């Protein structure tokens, strides 16, 4: 909740442009859907006057077929909303710790969906309309020889992308368009006569490097 409040109250991001993902559960390993996160997100969006509908997508393939469906909270499987050092639950050796995560995405409404990534867009689509700007990992499980056990002591591990949040603040899908890089691009323009905004993609890539 602190991160959401930071984004909306301190940075003044439009909550209508924020979408979140949660863990849809793993029936094979008997790990339930992250209902706690769903309920928390619903309450946070409700405070902003937003009805946060839950949409179960599970996979990117399903997401590209069904699309947004007026959703605000989207559940995906372990490929997108689970973290451990070994990857998804089935790859975790006995003794390994892990847990579901919840991710926050910003929507760039000026970016049109590219159909090469699927018929319809959704938060985990690769077309660039949505950008993950932060996530919280809930370290609450330990893998035993034949099952997943709840940890007695659990914690939340947060991660956020500074450049990504800055990109959201200026509503630009290009993370290099924020103020941090402008003086560098201006120096390149003066020295080499190359303007970042007018450059072709290969030139932009060279300027970023």
Language model features: what each stretch is:
Residues 1-209:
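Structured aminoacyl-transfer and RNA-binding surfaces used for tRNA recognition/handling
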């Amino acid at each position: 909740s602190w991160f959401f409040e930071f984004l909306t109250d301190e940075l003044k991001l439009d909550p209508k442009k924020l979408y979140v993902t949660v863990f849809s559960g793993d029936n094979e390993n008997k790990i339930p859907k992250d209902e706690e996160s769903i309920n928390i997100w619903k309450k946070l969006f409700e405070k902003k006057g937003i009805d946060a509908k839950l949409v179960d997508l599970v996979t990117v393939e399903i997401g590209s077929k069904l699309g947004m469906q007026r959703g605000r909270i989207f559940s995906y499987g372990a490929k997108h909303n689970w973290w451990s050092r070994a990857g998804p639950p089935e790859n975790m050796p006995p003794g390994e710790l892990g847990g579901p995560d919840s991710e926050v995405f910003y929507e760039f409404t000026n970016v049109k969906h590219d159909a090469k990534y699927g018929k319809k867009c959704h938060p985990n689509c690769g077309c660039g309309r949505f950008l993950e700007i932060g996530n919280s990992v809930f370290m609450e499980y330990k893998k035993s020889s034949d099952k997943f056990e709840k940890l007695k002591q659990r914690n939340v591990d947060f991660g956020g992308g500074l450049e990504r949040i800055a990109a959201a603040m200026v509503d630009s899908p290009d993370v290099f368009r924020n103020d941090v890089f402008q003086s560098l691009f201006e120096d390149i323009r003066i020295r080499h006569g190359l303007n970042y905004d007018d450059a072709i993609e290969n030139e932009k890539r060279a300027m970023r490097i």
